[in-house]
Amino acid sequence: MKTSSQKEEGKRGRPHDDDDDDVDLLGEIAVSANNQGTSIPRKRDYRQRAHCNPLANGRWEDTPTAPDAFREDGHYERRFLEELKKDEGKEAKITFADIGCGFGGLLVRLSPLFPKELIMGMEIRAQVSEYVRERSLALRKEHPGEYQNISGLRTNSMKFLPNYFEKGQLKKIFFLFPDPHFKRSKRRRRIIQTALIAEYAFCLREGGILYTQTDVEDVGDWMKEKLDMSPLFRPMTEGELDEDVCVELLRRGTPTEEGQKVKRNSGSTWLHCYVRVHGNPRY
């Protein structure tokens, strides 16, 4: 008899977890497209395996050695960064991070809502991350003065997040529709792990928000259990949830491509959001 997780896996049509055992993280590109930001790129030109093994020893030559080695002007226009610096009185830094951003739907929705925040999508899949970056460039060209604050990069967030962000740098961090890794033997690949929660807390400032959402109940329960056990986070209250514009977006199921798919299929999602509280991660 199939378990509920196996039924869910079949219903969603996800590839079998065994398919991603030996993924060459640089050799997985199926189609190459050089859009150069002239028009909105087409997703079909950026085909990609659905899964990557985050525990594989890939090659990540572009990973900064420390946050101060990361160049924001490699992703955002220098003039826009200078305007933010003038307004804020300090160097502009990324404050929102979408981990496993997929095709960047959330970034596009957040951009006009938070025009003064630098928003970064972080994606492990090479072609998908390239799509997000080119999509951002194309949107800037089609809408002058808009979408200046979003971009995407390729990285393994389970290994390198502190290489990009200083302690307390982020205001918001999103984990939306992460790979479920259904098999018990593969669950250590899930993005929310007890050992990693301290890293996420390190990057979030006190009062910052961590958002999780999934269409797999077992994964939702897993993430909630891990975060409930952490002394560095507390669940958002009902009042806080009702007042949060990001929660409103996520409840409607419209900001991400995966969320739109679930909504079209009349599926359910599990949303759990947490506030970073006082306390020092063990670093």
Residues covered by each model-derived region:
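S-adenosyl-L-methionine
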Residues: 2-97, 105-114, 136-167
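Conserved S-adenosyl-L-methionine
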Residues: 100
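Conserved SAM/SAH-binding beta-strand->alpha-helix loop
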Residues: 125
